[in-house]
Amino acid sequence: MKDLLKSVLRIMGLLAVSMVCLTGYLAIQNKLTARDILSFMQERYVQDEAGYVEELRKGMLARQACIRINYRGTLQEDMEKKALDMLEMVFETNEPDIPDDADYLEYTYQGVSAELISFFGIYQVTYHFDYLETQEETEYTGRQVEAILSELDIKDTDDYTKVKKIHDYIVKELDYDEGLSRATPYEALTTGKATCQGYATLFYRMAEEAGVPCRIIGGTADGQPHAWNIVKLDGLWYNIDCTWDDPVGKGVDKYKIRHEFFLKSDNRSFLMHIRDGKYQTSEFQKKYPMAKKDYVRN
């Protein structure tokens, strides 16, 4: 142990510490004790990206505020970029029996920063997350969604019927939160109010629970930040905007259910909806081919 401690003392100057803010980058140098370095070198490490993503995903699903990943990589790796890339891979991991992963996870966390320690291809990344929902709130949402779907009685229906009933339920039961403070399915279900993010994330959760492939799309609509959904029917993907189908303002019938933005292509009705860049890539478009025409039920 003494020999190892002496070796650690000799290499202390080679250990770099930095802070990665995921909206930017800030590098700082820190002094670490020999005990810090010794502990760092004796940690258990994941050996590949799949293990990294699984560790990060497991912690996020448990709504852990602090998640530490120990990763054995190479000297040439850009770990600041990888820390971001691994987070994106978590959001792209969608297991059918876990309806609160993937997009639900992405749209119910608020922000993240990360600390990075590196030493000759060995890395320790510590993420610090702020979530919009607690684990208890997410679990409550899951129970409520199951109860609502049971009431809608759509288990043995076709996907079109499932999508329409979920859309109509959300439009009927929710009011738009003009105070822009309620962005989660939990807040939507407990207060009856939500922003577009709350509408889209609740629709996503219900569609996933019902077995209908669905994504949340972030971007702008009429020049303002916005979120909506796409769903897969008969092999193609269609837009759904529950928020814009929910009438607001004076003199409107709040109980009237519209379908002006229901199962639409990117043409006509959705020309004012502009996706964020990551939803416009050729890779995304190939994976989620959009219909050229609005959906018409046979």
Name each model feature, range by range:
Residues 134-188:
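Secondary-structure boundary elements
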Residues 188-197:
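Periplasmic OmpA-like peptidoglycan-binding domain that tethers envelope proteins to the cell wall
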Residues 198-268:
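Hydrophobic/aromatic-rich core segments of domains that either
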